[in-house]
Amino acid sequence: MAANVVIRPVGRDERAAWEPLWNGYLAFYEATLAPGASDVAWERFHDSGEPMFLLGAYVDGRLTGIVQYLFHRSSWTPGNYCYLQDLFVAEGVGSLTLA
C-alpha cells in the first residue's frame, strides 16, 4: 500500500517535529555540535536572505524525513551548485513502499 507522502518546506512553527529527526541524524553520525549551532541553523532555514533551506517529507501529515541543503557558487561553472547537506528519515520510513 502506498503512503501519502508530501514534500514541502518545514514551517517555523514545526521545530518540535524537526528536532527529533535532526538529533537522530546527529546521533547516527556521532556528531557533537557547538553550543547554539542548531538554533543558528534553524534561523537560517527560515531567513529569506540565507542560502540554506529545509524540506520535510510528511507521511500522512506527520514529518518523517528532512533534507537540509544550500546553494553555493563554484569555480567550475557560472551557475550555482545545490549541496545536499543533511538527509535523514525516521526509523522504518525508508522501508515504505511507494507506488
Language model segments and positions:
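Conserved glycine-rich acetyl-CoA-binding loop
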Residues: 76-77, 90-99
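Acetyl-CoA-dependent GNAT
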Residues: 9-79, 85
